[in-house]
Design a protein with these regions (language model features):
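N-terminal amphipathic alpha-helix/helix-capping segment at the start of soluble metabolic enzymes
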Residues: 1-5, 150-160
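N-terminal beta1-alpha1-beta2 module of alpha/beta enzyme domains
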Residues: 1-67
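Flexible, glycine-rich active-site loops centered on histidine and acidic residues
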Residues: 3, 7-18, 80-143
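Hydrophobic faces of well-ordered beta-strands that scaffold small-molecule active sites
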Residues: 4-8, 40-42, 72-75, 102-106, ...
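Generic structural signal for well-ordered alpha-helices
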Residues: 25-30, 57-61, 88-92, 132-139, ...
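Glycine-rich "substrate-gating" loop/helix at the edge of Rossmann-like oxidoreductase active sites
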Residues: 49-53, 77-82
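Glycine-enriched alpha-helix->loop->beta-strand junction motifs that scaffold or abut catalytic
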Residues: 66-69, 98-100
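Conserved small/polar residues in nucleotide/adenosyl-binding loops
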Residues: 169-171
Length: 171
């Protein structure tokens, strides 16, 4: 059987609200689990009134708590928007609560306009070229903690959180 996954943006239907959109996402994840889907992904989008998945790790916690077997992942977290340590702590927490079920997809674009990026308080002068170093830093936080390690993700160190590089191709 070909493994199938769901990518959900948690759309807010006209006349509805974000809370209902997130409840609908949980219903969709439960259906995907019952149908034997392999993974359920949510994507990070900011400042978009029609999408409720901006706080992706929080939304994934809701989905993971309401399902039992399906893998849950970010498809993806836009790495330029976040410090690698914070991502490691968030997804380390998810992995500690739901062992063997958490995936982390990373994107290299900010995925938002400059006004929104500024509101997220990230360095607007950071280069996309920082992506490889940020990925390596993030992966380091998931390695087993070594004596004398100055900074650790707790939870995070030594946990199995597969990291995926997301992207798109132009045809």
């Amino acid at each position: 059987m070909i493994p199938l996954s769901v990518l959900d943006l948690s759309p807010v239907a006209e006349g509805s609200d974000a809370g209902q959109a997130l409840r609908n996402s949980l219903d969709l994840a439960r259906l995907a689990e019952r149908l034997g889907y392999t993974r359920y992904w949510m994507a990070e989008h900011h400042n978009m009134p029609g999408i409720a998945s901006a706080a992706t790790a929080v939304a994934l916690a809701h989905i993971a708590a309401g399902t039992a077997r399906i893998r849950i992942g970010a498809g993806g977290i836009m790495l330029p928007n976040h410090a690698p340590l914070l991502i490691a702590e968030q997804f380390g927490t998810l992995a500690a609560l739901h062992p063997g079920r958490i995936d982390l997809g990373l994107g290299r674009a900010p995925g938002s306009d400059q006004v929104t990026a500024r509101a997220m308080r990230r360095n607007l002068h950071a280069e996309i070229d920082d992506f490889p170093q940020d990925v390596m830093e993030l992966m380091g936080y998931f390695r087993p903690v070594v004596p004398g390690q100055a900074v650790q993700a707790v939870p995070g160190g030594g946990l199995d959180v597969p990291i995926w590089k997301i992207g798109r191709a132009h045809v």
